[in-house]
Design a protein with these regions (language model features):
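TRNA-recognition modules of translation machinery and tRNA-sensing kinases, especially anticodon-binding
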Residues: 1-262
Length: 262
C-alpha cells in the first residue's frame, strides 16, 4: 500500500509507539539488515521448510527476510552468553517480505496479505527454566499494546497441527474486522525451546560450574502494522472522521484521520 499525508503519519506513529513501548519494557532496539544468507534462514527454521514463501535473490543466493526474527536471532549464532546477561531482550522494526504463494481470492486482498509490510518484532533469549516466564511476559506486552490501541481482540493458543514445527508453544492475537466480519491475526508469540538455539549453537555459561547449556529462544510480533491500521480505521469511525486512539495522538499529532490537511 501507499500511505499519504495523515495515513503516512499514522504508520510512522504506530512504529514509534511500538518501539517506545518495547523500550519501556526493557528491550534493546536493533536495526538489522533485511537481506540474509541461507544459513541465517536455516538457523531460525524458515529454511528449508518455508523456502517457497521467501523471496530468493538467485544471483547472489540471498533471501529477503520474512520477519526480523531471522537477522536478530542470528546475532547470537555461535555465541556463549554469560548467565548473568540473561534474558537477552531485543526489538526491531523492519520491512518484511513474503511471497504468499498459493494465496488467492477475496480473503487475501487489500491489507489482509501483502508481499511487503512493516512489523515490530520482539526476540528474547533466556535460560530453559525461565523461558515460560519470558513467554508470559511477551504475551502480556502484546496484549497491553492492543488494549492501549482500544481494539477488540482475542487470544488463541494454537494446537500442534496449527503450529510451526519449530515452536514448542504458540499463541496468536487476533483483532476483529468489522468489514469482513472475521478475526485477523496481528501477532504470534512463540517459545522455540532449544530448536533454534541448537541450530545456531546459541548457549550460555553457568556462573557456578562454568558448564554450557543451550538457551531457549522466543519471539513475537508487537505488532504487524497493516492489519492494525485497518482495524483502527474500521473500529473508530465517527461522522467527523476516524478517531485516533489516545495513545497515538502524541505520536501522529492529530485526533481525527480525515481529509483535512495535516
Amino acid at each position: 500500500p501507499v500511505y499519504r499525508g495523515k495515513g503516512a503519519r499514522l504508520q510512522r506513529a504506530l512504529i514509534n509507539f511500538f518501539l517506545d513501548e518495547a523500550r519501556k519494557s526493557g528491550y534493546e532496539e536493533i536495526m538489522p539488515p533485511t537481506v540474509v544468507n541461507e544459513a541465517s534462514g536455516y538457523g531460525t527454521g524458515q529454511l528449508p521448510d518455508k523456502e517457497g514463501q521467501m523471496y530468493h535473490c538467485n544471483l547472489d543466493d540471498f533471501y529477503l527476510i520474512p520477519t526480523a526474527e531471522v537477522p536478530v536471532t542470528n546475532i547470537y549464532r555461535d555465541v556463549i552468553l554469560d548467565e548473568k546477561d540473561l534474558p537477552v531482550k531485543n526489538c526491531a522494526y523492519t520491512q518484511c517480505f513474503r511471497r504468499e504463494a498459493g494465496s488467492y481470492g477475496k480473503d487475501v486482498r487489500g491489507l489482509n496479505r501483502l508481499h511487503e509490510f512493516s512489523k515490530v518484532e520482539l526476540v528474547r533469549i533466556d535460560k530453559p527454566e525461565h523461558s515460560e516466564q519470558s513467554h508470559q511476559e511477551m504475551l502480556a506486552h502484546v496484549e497491553g499494546l492492543l488494549q492501549k490501541l482500544e481494539l477488540p481482540y482475542r487470544i488463541l493458543r494454537l494446537c500442534g497441527g496449527d503450529m510451526s514445527f519449530t515452536s514448542s508453544i504458540c499463541y496468536d492475537f487476533e483483532v476483529y474486522s468489522e468489514a469482513q466480519k472475521r478475526w485477523l491475526e496481528v501477532s504470534s508469540v512463540s517459545n522455540f525451546d532449544t530448536y533454534q538455539a541448537n541450530r545456531l549453537k546459541c548457549r550460555y555459561r553457568h556462573t557456578e560450574d562454568k558448564k554450557t547449556e543451550l538457551c531457549h529462544t522466543l519471539n513475537g510480533s508487537a505488532l504487524a502494522l497493516p492489519r492494525i491500521v485497518a482495524a483502527i480505521m474500521e473500529n473508530n469511525q465517527t461522522p467527523e472522521g476516524i478517531r485516533m486512539p489516545k495513545c497515538l495522538v502524541p505520536y501522529c499529532g492529530f485526533e481525527m484521520l480525515d481529509d483535512k490537511p495535516c
